[in-house]
């Protein structure tokens, strides 16, 4: 039976009922709905709506219901209730009879769903931080194992300067650290409890909303009932953080796809995270990484969709807000899966250090070192930049790397260039010179790895 049937003389059309009902997706809020109901039972007992005996009966029944569904909440989908609130109430009435009908006193589904969603978002934030930490651990482990893997760094997808695979890993560690921080910030703003706001104007019963908030794991009750039932900022913040993180994961995946390709051959992905072709027997496709890259779009879409849904809504609750759920449920599941698969990809990754070094020695990625060499000889950088550009053009014409040019050839471009130029053109010198904080100098990279391990508690 619908929770609102008294006003209506006709049954809802079956098509409208399916269109309107939300149990098929909001069943995911079952545990939060039950926990919120336990908290609400205590609150209305404190103002005399329930006796202590009735309160205990309801709590026992609600806890029984929670225990029944917790192993597999999808069993709820066998029923045909309008939404998760209706389902919980109907099951409660089955257990305790008419007493179950008293629980909703002073409460609206508007503040009920608001608290359910916020509680669910809090759980998700914690779970996702755990998944981020796991991927960060894998990145640090991979970095530590590949500190000597010199490879080209890229700008515009052209070889730019030598880096190490460890430095590359730590770049993504830093991106994920910001994602972790954004979740922490979002979580702080989830500390207020909307339950007790009623439909929009507040509850008619003088419950202690701050005590209720603390019972449900919040810090304090919200300050404005109208805002409380209308607020979905916590959903938007999670979707925004997920979208930014999926940008990072997509770039991570794209880099690995490129490094794994036959054209680069910098590394090989494990058989455990790749698949074959139904036609071409030789193929080993980086499907795990391609799916991470591809799934970013659905997360971005969830954020865009909810922003569009909310932007024109008048206060307070509108049924449009039911559209907050499917997007966030899917986005959080997708984000979590991508973090988990990203960690799995790194478990058995095999870096070809000979190939990465060979590639780093190509593409004139030591040209900047030659410019810095000239600067050290007293030549202004802009002039040095031009001189080295000419030297690179000359080396390209000879199909030789810069370090293969003779001193006499170098002196065509400037007389200050001498025998001491060759040591600075080595890959090791290129790395060593980048010794400022955050640079690719091996010692700086080691320090970054150690700092990350401390941060992760490793």
From Swiss-Prot:
Localization per Swiss-Prot or TrEMBL: Cytoplasm
GO BP term, example: L-arginine biosynthetic process
Pfam families according to UniProt: ASL_C2 (PF14698), Lyase_1 (PF00206)
One GO cellular component term noted in the UniProt record for this chain: cytosol
Domain of life: Bacteria
Record GO terms (molecular function): argininosuccinate lyase activity
Catalytic activity of the protein: 2-(N(omega)-L-arginino)succinate = fumarate + L-arginine
Pathway: Amino-acid biosynthesis; L-arginine biosynthesis; L-arginine from L-ornithine and carbamoyl phosphate: step 3/3
Cytoplasm is among the record's keywords: yes
Keyword tags: Amino-acid biosynthesis, Arginine biosynthesis, Cytoplasm, Lyase
InterPro entries named among the record's database cross-references: Arg_succ_lyase_C, Argininosuccinate_lyase, Fumarase/histidase_N, Fumarate_lyase_CS, Fumarate_lyase_fam, Fumarate_lyase_N, L-Aspartase-like
EC number(s) from the headed UniProt entry: 4.3.2.1
PANTHER family, A to Z: ARGININOSUCCINATE LYASE
Similarity-based family: Belongs to the lyase 1 family. Argininosuccinate lyase subfamily.
Protein's recorded name: Argininosuccinate lyase
Organism listed in the record: Actinobacillus pleuropneumoniae serotype 7 (strain AP76)
């Amino acid at each position: 039976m619908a929770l609102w049937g008294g006003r209506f003389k006709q049954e809802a059309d079956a098509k409208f009922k399916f269109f309107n009902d939300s149990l098929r997706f909001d069943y995911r809020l079952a545990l939060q709905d039950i926990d919120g109901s336990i908290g609400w039972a205590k609150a209305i007992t404190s103002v005399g709506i329930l006796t202590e005996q009735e309160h205990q009966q309801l709590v026992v029944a609600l806890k029984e219901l929670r225990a029944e569904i917790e192993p597999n909440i999808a069993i709820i989908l066998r029923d045909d209730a309008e939404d998760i609130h209706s389902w919980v109430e109907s099951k409660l009435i089955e257990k305790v009879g008419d007493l179950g009908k008293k629980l909703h006193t002073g409460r609206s589904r508007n503040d009920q769903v608001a608290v359910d969603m916020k509680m669910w978002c809090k759980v998700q934030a914690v779970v996702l931080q755990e998944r981020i930490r796991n991927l960060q651990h894998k990145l640090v482990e991979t970095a530590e194992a590949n500190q000597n893997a010199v490879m080209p760094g890229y700008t515009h997808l052209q070889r730019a300067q030598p880096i190490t695979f460890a430095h590359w890993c730590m770049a993504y560690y830093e991106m994920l650290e910001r994602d972790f921080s954004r979740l922490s910030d979002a979580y702080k703003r989830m500390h207020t409890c909307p339950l007790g706001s009623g439909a929009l104007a507040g509850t008619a019963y003088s419950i202690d909303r701050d005590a209720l908030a603390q019972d449900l794991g919040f810090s304090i009750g919200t300050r404005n009932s109208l805002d409380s039932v209308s607020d979905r900022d916590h959903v938007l913040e999670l979707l925004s953080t997920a979208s930014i993180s999926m940008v990072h994961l997509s770039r991570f995946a794209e880099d690995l796809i490129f490094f794994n390709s036959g054209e680069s051959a910098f590394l090989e992905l494990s058989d455990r995270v790749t698949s074959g072709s139904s036609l071409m027997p030789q193929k080993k496709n980086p499907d795990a990484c391609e799916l991470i890259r591809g799934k970013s779009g659905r997360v971005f879409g969830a954020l865009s969709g909810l922003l569009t849904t909310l932007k024109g809504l008048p206060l307070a609750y509108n049924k449009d807000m039911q559209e907050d759920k499917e997007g966030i449920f899917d986005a959080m599941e997708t984000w979590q899966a991508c973090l988990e698969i990203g960690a799995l990809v790194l478990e058995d990754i095999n870096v070809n250090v000979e190939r990465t070094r060979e590639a780093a020695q190509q593409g004139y990625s030591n040209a900047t070192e030659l410019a810095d060499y000239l600067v050290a000889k007293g030549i202004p950088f802009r002039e040095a930049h031009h001189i080295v550009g000419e030297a690179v053009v000359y080396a390209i014409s000879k199909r030789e790397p810069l370090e293969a040019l003779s001193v006499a050839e170098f002196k065509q471009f400037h007389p200050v260039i001498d025998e001491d130029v060759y040591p600075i053109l080595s890959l090791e010198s290129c790395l060593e010179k980048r010794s400022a904080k955050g640079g690719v100098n091996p010692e700086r990279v080691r320090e970054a790895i150690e700092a990350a391990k401390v941060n992760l508690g490793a």
